[in-house]
Amino acid sequence: KALKPDLIIACYGINCGIYKPFDEERFNSYKDGLQRLKAKAEAKGAKIIFMTPPVYDKPNPKFNYDDVMKAYSEWLISKRKDSWKVIDLHSVMKKKLADKRTKNPNFKYSRDGIHPGTEGHELMSQQIINFFAVKPPLKDHQPNAYGRLLMFIRERMRVQRDAWLTEIGHKRPMKKGKTIAEANKIAANNTVRIQQNLETILKASN
């Protein structure tokens, strides 16, 4: 209600199975939750894009929790037939992980098997880029150009996230965010810097 987004990208699943073997009741709750989220988003005039959960890669001798994520992902992908917009992270990450491990058996996208690191997030973000049919420049012709770009993007995201979490009274343990007005001012300055860096990269790529 406070943000009034026009586009929502939602990724649920990795915590929804609560790290236990597949359970039909939990699975139905997951499906019901996403269907209700979609209905509420569209009722407010927002478009919604779902992403399948990323790979779970933490060994467990008792059962393979990633099989639960696979089931959740397959259901989400099946909803494309009902005109749901779905970006598949799970199968892409699983295939890439297997490919990487043919050369390095110890390769990981995530240190804890749950939260992807930089390379994992890069692969995930590329699937979003592919969904929107945006072709990024292939080479970084300017030293640290992408690094500077990412720095400004992260700062814009961080300050707005913390401001809104504080504004809506979220109970998440965190430092108090800035006011919305202060955050928007900082975000606007970062947007200018982001655009400047993008223009530099694009010019160098032509």
Q: Can you say where each PLM-predicted feature lies in the sequence?
A:
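Mature catalytic domains of secreted/periplasmic carbohydrate-active enzymes
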Residues: 1, 26-28, 118, 122-123
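Proline-aspartate-enriched helix->loop->beta-strand connector
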Residues: 1-14
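Structural beta-sheet core signal
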Residues: 10, 50-51
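Extracytoplasmic/secreted cell-surface and envelope-processing proteins
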Residues: 17-22, 58-61, 96-97
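Glycine-rich anion/phosphate-binding loops
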Residues: 23-35
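A short helix->loop->beta-strand "cap" motif at the edges of active sites that frequently abuts
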Residues: 39-47, 84
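Substrate-gating cap/lid alpha-helix
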Residues: 58-90
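Conserved catalytic region of serine esterases and O-acyltransferases that act on ester linkages
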Residues: 82, 102-206
